Design a protein with these regions (language model features):
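A charged N-terminal "starter" segment
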Residues: 1-124, 130-143, 166, 181, ...
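Active-site loop/helix belt of alpha/beta enzymes
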Residues: 3, 139, 151-202
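Short beta-strand segments
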Residues: 61, 128, 144-150, 195-197
Length: 202
């Protein structure tokens, strides 16, 4: 996988993003502003896509950049969109994402948010706490789910520790078998997979 060079360059007496002069962008939109280069987005996405096996699906995490134009662009070329709130769910739907291609992950999901996405339609929900599981049980709406757990021996060299001990980001590994049994016992929950971070920020 290669990292794209910066699209910003000085050419023909002007600073440009790709072939678009910054002076023209400022004249049209004023400042301050954010400008995104679609060519760079595509280049980075395609580079990652080519580096991974075909069996791996790519999801764009809306929290990385919720700009509607960026989300719409990735909704068209990525396998799906990952959301972390009901607000991001609405961004995904407005971006044209198919409901089966929306994945709800992240700690702190409220019962109201879970009901909101279930009523609207969702591809998959990642369960990260007993409270979330209890809410899904009580709502009684069929949905694909995965269980997020923290491996007993996780790496600890980064800014965030996401393995090794219980945390808000999933179940302790010692509770995994029990949690799997609990999910499988609920008729309207379809266990689709497991979610884990083998290290930090990976």
């Amino acid at each position: 996988m290669t990292i794209a060079h910066s699209p910003i360059a000085y050419k023909d007496g002007q600073w440009r993003i790709s072939e678009c002069a910054l002076s023209e962008i400022v004249a049209e939109y004023s400042t301050p502003l954010f400008a995104y280069d679609r060519h760079t987005l595509d280049s980075q996405f395609n580079s990652l896509r080519q580096a991974l096996p075909d069996v791996v699906d790519l999801y764009y995490s809306i929290k990385a950049n919720p700009n509607p134009a960026v989300v719409s662009h990735f909704a068209a070329c990525a396998a799906g969109l990952e959301i972390a709130s009901a607000a991001e769910y609405e961004i995904a739907r407005n971006a044209g994402a198919q409901i089966e291609n929306i994945l709800f992950a992240g700690p702190g999901k409220t019962a109201e948010e879970l009901e909101h996405v279930l009523r609207g339609g969702i591809g998959e929900i990642h369960i990260e706490s007993s409270e979330e599981l209890a809410a899904l049980e009580s709502l009684g709406i069929p949905v694909n789910v995965s269980i997020r757990f923290n491996p007993a021996s996780g790496a600890s060299g980064g800014a965030m520790r996401m393995g090794g001990k219980p945390s808000p980001f999933g179940f302790d590994e010692e509770l995994l078998a029990e949690t799997v049994d609990r999910v499988r016992a609920v008729e309207h929950l379809n266990l689709h997979g497991l979610h884990m971070f083998a290290g930090t920020q990976l």
